[in-house]
């Protein structure tokens, strides 16, 4: 199996080193193409349409850092660096969970969405933490969860997101929706000596889906769609308002 690894925490992060060790359990080839700096919060954004150039730095035969976003890294890996299409894209391991609205902001998730858009099975891995980061649960359980997912498979154009709890004891593995935060939460700004602002955003967990499950000690698996369309609302609006809106141009 040929595996492409990327992340949003950067080429030198501990999480990507751990993911390389995890991938060795089932990979014949491992390629790493990751941002050269921390690009957390990049979502599925791209640098390459707006930058005149992107740097690719080769560290060894199959390991590269890129001056772009996680999504850039996947695109560049598939179209420039790799000579074969990978069988699997792995992104992470992220420092912190990717649940609730984090899914919209996360570069870790953005990378696997880029892979899924090209019909490549793609999995994001994120480790929750309280205080200092502890990778133990990911180290022990990630190889087993990934192997099971690859065995059972899932539809094309769907990415998988695995979140590992920070609890000392793992209660089990559950399939769960992304869940919800209180989006406003406790938002505070602190002015720095240079006049810039530091932002601290502490959001309340509402307890649903993966947000609540990882707090309870579960590893969660969440399928993520590329298509953002709400089909229930779309069909309801077509049935109720199509004629009214068509009159705008008639």
UniProtKB/Swiss-Prot annotation:
Pfam families: SurE (PF01975). Its EC number is 3.1.3.5. GO terms for molecular function: 3'-nucleotidase activity; 5'-nucleotidase activity; exopolyphosphatase activity; metal ion binding; nucleotide binding. It catalyses: a ribonucleoside 5'-phosphate + H2O = a ribonucleoside + phosphate. It comes from the Bacteria. It is found in: Cytoplasm. It is an enzyme of class 3 (hydrolase). One of its GO terms (cellular component) is cytoplasm. Binds 1 divalent metal cation per subunit. A divalent metal cation binds at residues 8-9, 40, 94. Keywords: Cytoplasm, Hydrolase, Metal-binding, Nucleotide-binding. Its cofactor is a divalent metal cation. The keyword Zinc-finger does not apply. Belongs to the SurE nucleotidase family. Nucleotidase that shows phosphatase activity on nucleoside 5'-monophosphates. HAMAP family: SurE. This is 5'-nucleotidase SurE. The gene is surE.
């Amino acid at each position: 199996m040929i595996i492409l690894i990327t992340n949003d925490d950067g080429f030198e992060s501990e999480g990507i080193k751990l993911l390389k060790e995890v991938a060795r359990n089932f990979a014949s080839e491992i390629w790493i193409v990751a941002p050269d700096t921390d690009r957390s919060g990049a979502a599925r954004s791209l640098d390459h349409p707006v930058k005149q150039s992107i740097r690719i730095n080769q560290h060894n035969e199959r390991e590269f850092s890129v001056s772009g976003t996680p999504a850039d890294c996947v695109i560049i890996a598939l179209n420039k660096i790799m000579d074969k299409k990978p069988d699997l894209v792995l992104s992470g391991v992220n420092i912190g969970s990717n649940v609730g609205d984090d899914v919209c902001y996360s570069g870790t998730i953005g990378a696997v969405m880029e892979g899924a858009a090209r019909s490549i099975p793609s999995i994001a891995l994120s480790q929750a933490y309280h205080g200092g980061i502890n990778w133990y649960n990911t180290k022990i359980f990630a190889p087993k969860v990934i192997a099971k997912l690859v065995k059972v498979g899932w539809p094309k154009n769907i990415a998988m997101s695995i979140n590992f709890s920070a609890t000392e004891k793992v209660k089990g593995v559950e399939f769960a929706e992304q869940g919800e935060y209180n989006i406003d939460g406790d938002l505070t700004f602190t002015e720095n000596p240079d006049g810039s602002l530091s932002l601290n955003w502490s959001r309340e967990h509402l307890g649903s889906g993966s947000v609540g499950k990882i707090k309870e000690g579960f590893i969660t698996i969440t399928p993520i769609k590329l298509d953002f369309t709400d089909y229930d609302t779309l069909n309801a609006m077509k049935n109720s308002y199509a004629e009214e809106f068509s009159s705008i141009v008639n």
